[in-house]
Structures are given as C-alpha cells and as structure tokens.
C-alpha cells in the first residue's frame, strides 16, 4: 500500500489500532501472534511489550533486508519470537543482527509443490487451451488488490514492451473483473487468464 492510500485511510487505521489494543488488554491472551503487516503490527508489538506481560510472537517476519532496516531495534525490543517463511532470513537476522529467528516453511511453496505433483508440466496444452502462440511468455502478476494493479500494471507493461519477441500473459486475480485490467492494458497485446497462475508459471 502506497503513501496516499494510507493517508486516506488513516482514521480507520488508528481506530482499528486502538480497538486492537483494547481487545488485547480485555482478553489478556497467553500470547499475541502478529502476522505480517509491520506498519501496523510493530506498533501493536510495542504496546504489548510496554503495557502488558504477554509474549509477542511474529509470523512472516518484516522484510527489513529490503527496506527500513532500522526496524530491527524495535523488533529486538518488542518481539519475543520471530517466525519466517523465507529461509535466507534466518542468516540475515542471526548473523547480521544477532537476533535468532525460526524458519517454519512456506505455505505457498508447499502448495506449488503439491500442484506440480498433481499436474505434470504440459506447456503445449496450456498454449492450446488459452489460444496462445508458440513463443516465449512474459508472465505479469500485478497483484491481488485493485490499488496494487493500478500502481503496478502500467509499469510492468512499459517494461515488457522492450521485449517484442515475447507474448504477454496476465494472471488475473480472483474477484477482479477483466474490465478492470483492460482499462490499464489499453492497446497492448495482453492475454488475461484466470485461475491458472501456477500453470502459467510452469
């Protein structure tokens, strides 16, 4: 989520944060488990650490290796156990920041592995089923929310235009109508497919 959408929803975000803190105090759980979304959850972690005796567990560790590495100070202070779905993060946190974390596997990797076992790779059938040409494919995965698609798709199409020998295939997200994509696709030659993301990536 970019800066402007956050600004537009600031009142709602603060209201939800206040309610979340009140619920934690009222319920007094054995442990608070935070999931992803560091902009919101690190604030909750700080509150729980400073105002209660409840342990804080964090699932899907903040991607401080990509941006906002300074957040490690808050993580060390406020989070008791950190659980990662990316194997390389263990070395990053442990060696660089001396903060041990746990790699617990990746549900998406497990899902893809199960899909590959159940559906042997068959590129010819995929091309035929979707009326695609027998030429290399650039897969476009612009996101699952309208704001992400609005922000990402035009830039992706611009970058992909530098490869005229490839065909562009856009993986449509569930709940997003084809018409929404078409307003950003414009005159670009793009095939939009739904419910075939793993098949496309094979």
Where are these regions (language model features)?
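Charged active-site motifs of nucleotide-sugar-dependent glycosyltransferases
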Residues: 132-139, 166-167
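Short aromatic/hydrophobic-glycine micro-motifs
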Residues: 98-99, 132, 190
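Donor-nucleotide binding loops and adjacent catalytic segments primarily
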Residues: 148-202
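Solvent-exposed alpha-helices and their adjacent loops that cap or buttress functional pockets
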Residues: 74-76, 130-133, 200-202
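Active-site and donor-binding regions of nucleotide-sugar-utilizing enzymes
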Residues: 1-127, 141-152, 163-165, 173-175
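Structured helix-beta-strand junction loops
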Residues: 27, 78, 133-135, 187-188
